[in-house]
């Protein structure tokens, strides 16, 4: 009896397992998510063959944004504040920079400064240059009369032998020696001329004999105002001419319309009288 019961139980359990397997296979499968670990899933899809799809875990962004209030105080102040030099460079307007006087401009060479001063203050520079040049040449001529020999100095500074031989073998005497010294001292002469011109210009401006040149910004602004006024006047004249022509055309059209109306009314009246 015991053996029969055991056999019956085993047969029943095997039948039950077979039934469950068959029912599992026959039942429609939609989606069976199985959580293996955090962030990954295995899905069983209703297809003819079993496909196991692994969904990758969502990766978090490694680069996290730090809010502004979490930054250190030093970095936060540096990001919010702008350096004074940057502010000054931004706020600097090129039109506000005035043209520098060539007598005070040390950024250009001596010869360029001399030419620029000649173009701007030629009436003052020419007399100053003549006076200083006369003093320079007279001083060198007097030195040549006293026996000053400039030939060793010319050989020392490395001038060509042709120029040195001309001075050695020339019969010009003191005048040629003075002229050679005068040409050698050209940088010093130009410097003295510019200094004398600067002093003379300041003196003449102080006592009203020489007007102060306007700034470039003011000059261009005045020219722009003059051009604007001329343009406005021309526009007003053109507008008046156009408005006059339009009024004349309007009057002519009105006259023609009135004549046409009168003719039409006259014809209508005439036809009515005839009827």
Curated annotation (Swiss-Prot):
Pfam families linked to this entry: FAM210A-B_dom
Chain positions covered by the region annotation Disordered: 51-100
Coiled-coil positions: 221-275
Domain of life according to the entry: Eukaryota
DUF1279 domain ranges (all copies): 105-217
Family annotation (Gene3D superfamilies): 6.10.140.1430
Bias kind Polar residues: ranges: 56-65, 75-95
GO cellular component, one term: membrane
Subcellular location(s) of the protein: Membrane; Mitochondrion; Cytoplasm
Membrane-topology annotation of the record: Single-pass membrane protein
Keyword Cytoplasm included in the entry's annotation: yes
Keywords: Coiled coil, Cytoplasm, Membrane, Mitochondrion, Transmembrane, Transmembrane helix
Transmembrane regions listed in the UniProt entry: 124-144
Family matches, as InterPro entries: FAM210A/B-like, FAM210A/B-like_dom
Summary of the function given for this chain in its UniProt record: May play a role in the structure and strength of both muscle and bone.
Family: Belongs to the FAM210 family.
PANTHER family in the record: PROTEIN FAM210A, PROTEIN FAM210B, MITOCHONDRIAL
Protein name (Swiss-Prot/TrEMBL): Protein FAM210A
Gene designation per UniProt: fam210a
């Amino acid at each position: 009896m015991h053996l029969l019961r055991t056999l019956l139980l085993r047969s029943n359990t095997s039948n039950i397992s077979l039934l469950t397997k068959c029912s599992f296979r026959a039942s429609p499968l939609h989606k069976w998510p199985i959580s293996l670990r955090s962030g990954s899933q295995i899905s069983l899809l209703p297809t003819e063959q079993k496909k196991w799809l692994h969904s990758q875990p969502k990766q978090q962004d490694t680069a996290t944004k730090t809010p502004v209030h979490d930054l250190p105080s030093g970095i936060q102040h540096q990001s919010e504040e702008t350096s004074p030099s940057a502010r000054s460079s931004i706020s600097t307007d090129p039109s506000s920079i005035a043209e520098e006087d060539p007598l005070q401009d040390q950024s250009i060479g001596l010869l360029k400064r001399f030419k620029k001063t000649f173009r701007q203050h030629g009436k003052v520079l020419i007399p100053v240059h003549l006076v200083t040049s006369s003093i320079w040449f007279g001083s060198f001529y007097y030195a040549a009369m006293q026996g000053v020999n400039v030939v060793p100095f010319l050989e020392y500074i490395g001038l060509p032998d042709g120029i040195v031989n001309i001075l050695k073998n020339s019969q010009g005497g003191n005048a040629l020696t003075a002229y050679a010294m005068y040409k050698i001292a050209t940088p010093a002469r130009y410097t003295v001329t510019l200094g004398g011109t600067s002093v003379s210009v300041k003196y003449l401006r102080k006592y009203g004999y020489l007007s102060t040149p306007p700034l470039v910004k003011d000059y261009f602004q005045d020219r722009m105002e003059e051009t604007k006024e001329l343009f406005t006047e021309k526009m007003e004249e053109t507008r008046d001419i156009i408005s006059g022509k339009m009024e004349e055309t309007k009057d002519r059209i009105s006259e023609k319309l009135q004549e046409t109306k009168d003719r039409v009314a006259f014809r209508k009246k005439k036809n009515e009288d005839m009827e």
